[in-house]
Amino acid sequence: MAIVKSKPTSPGRRFVVKVVNHDLHKGEPYAPLLDKKSKSGGRNNTGRITTRHVGGGHKQHYRIVDFRRNKDGIPATVERIEYDPNRTAYIALVVYADGERRYIIAPKGLSAGDKIESGNAAAIKVGNTLPVRNIPLGSVIHCVELKPGKGAQLARSAGASAQLVAKDGAYVTLRLRSGEMRKVLSDCRATLGEVSNTEHNLRSLGKAGAKRWLGIRPTVRGVAMNPVDHPHGGGEGRTSGGRHPVSPWGIPTKGYKTRKNKRTDNMIVRRRDKK
């Protein structure tokens, strides 16, 4: 991968920083693994905005990605690495020995022609998927399940990973990139290695229009609104908002804890690090 900066022929070109990977497939995606993806504009079935700052963007097809990796004992060969507009990580098209093709999240270092497999007896090798109880301590893993057989839920985005730090009976302990220490059932599966496109955080979109291509609409400050629209709105001239920062619905923001999931509190050994 390469970090590419453009000549400053315009303000938008001056600030853009691209991450270019010349090993990505340049043709069309594999059609049988595509699905339609309709845009909601952030609205629900009644037409009300339920997610702000969403709308527009380039049309996309959804790539059906295999997060379960449940074809045990059947080796697969990586056919190509592809760009996926629906996620920050790259995806790999793999063809199994029985002829079936699937998309998987591509780990760092995986390339066309590599062999991968999944199952209890899979080798300790980047791209292989096996239960975490069979993975050595200290290993770097990604695409971790939280419930056996449900499919990967943790460490799926570009450059993400977790480290296996302890095993204790039916559970193992993982250290996540946020600093959180979390217990996971030892029957849950994970894939060895870290997720590809590790330089994704170095990119700069360069201009507002690039954000619109991604389907992200502008974020307006509350102090720039009218009182009817936001608790910080109104006032003569510029104001500070007059109170501690809140959302449009009056909920404190900037550090206010919103986690409401007691059911899994006992699985978190240590909360994430404060930034």
From Swiss-Prot:
Cited function: One of the primary rRNA binding proteins. Required for association of the 30S and 50S subunits to form the 70S ribosome, for tRNA binding and peptide bond formation. It has been suggested to have peptidyltransferase activity; this is somewhat controversial. Makes several contacts with the 16S rRNA in the 70S ribosome.
Family annotation (InterPro entries): NA-bd_OB-fold, Rib_uL2_dom2, Ribosomal_uL2, Ribosomal_uL2_bac/org-type, Ribosomal_uL2_C, Ribosomal_uL2_CS, Ribosomal_uL2_dom3, Ribosomal_uL2_RNA-bd_dom
Region (Disordered): 28-55, 224-258
GO molecular function terms noted in the UniProt entry: rRNA binding; structural constituent of ribosome; transferase activity
Protein's gene: rplB
SUPFAM superfamilies to which the protein is assigned, alphabetical: Nucleic acid-binding proteins, Translation proteins SH3-like domain
Gene3D superfamilies, alphabetized: 2.30.30.30, Nucleic acid-binding proteins, Ribosomal protein L2, domain 3
GO cellular component labels: large ribosomal subunit
Comp. bias intervals (Basic and acidic residues): 28-38
Keyword annotations from UniProtKB, A to Z: Ribonucleoprotein, Ribosomal protein, RNA-binding, rRNA-binding
GO biological process: cytoplasmic translation
Family per similarity comment: Belongs to the universal ribosomal protein uL2 family.
Pfam family membership, one: Ribosomal_L2_C
Protein name, UniProt field: Large ribosomal subunit protein uL2
Record note on quaternary structure: Part of the 50S ribosomal subunit. Forms a bridge to the 30S subunit in the 70S ribosome.
PANTHER family linked: LARGE RIBOSOMAL SUBUNIT PROTEIN UL2M (PTHR13691:SF5), RIBOSOMAL PROTEIN L2 (PTHR13691)
